[in-house]
């Protein structure tokens, strides 16, 4: 069983903050959401004040806060929260980018925000997704894309379209929902040709993750971590 995961980072401190469990998608393979979870209605300043307080213990350190969900942009005051965070804090937000391009044009004006856009083929339109990502790239946002590789033929083809049209995107191997008390079940059953395709688009991913087990330490790629079911923690 896996005891600990460690990955290289450009920051001295990385904080993962779950802004909301609520999501407008209900993907069959996702455990990090609840379509019925109450929306976060806390004042934005109370959230940013709490995050500023935590980071105040790490003066002269480089810090990034990763805003997670659910879907973080369901929190209507998210931009006010961003604006109240101290300047020294870098911000990354993981989003399914399901809002309209018009919404992006009207509201996205803080290029300090790093965006990790995730494509989910059970719900998202690949053509609209590409349009939104390209618009943000053209307007100087630092945006990367994680593309969920569902083995269903139609879903897989949607993912390939995005990987072909967004050079900074990368494939994300999926796991089934948890079984037998493990965090994840086995990875989906991909055909040999699908595995070959995933490897093709994973060629530029050289980042390794340090995995600590009871009897040894391994350095594995993110793709191997998921596809070979190495991500089941003890407990």
Q: Which ranges hold each PLM region?
A:
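Canonical Radical SAM [4Fe-4S] cluster-binding loop centered on the CxxxCxxC motif
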Residues: 6-47
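Core AdoMet radical
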Residues: 34-45, 60-75, 86-101, 110-129, ...
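Radical SAM enzyme [4Fe-4S]-AdoMet core and its adjacent flexible, acidic
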Residues: 118-235
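A short acidic (Asp/Glu
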Residues: 76-79, 103-105, 155-159
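Acidic (Asp/Glu)-rich catalytic clusters
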Residues: 57-58, 82-86, 104-112, 131-140, ...
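N-terminal [4Fe-4S]-dependent radical SAM core
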Residues: 1-16, 223-235
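Conserved N-terminal glycine/acidic-rich loop preference
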Residues: 3-11, 28-29, 108, 132, ...
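A short, N-terminal amphipathic alpha-helix
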Residues: 50-58
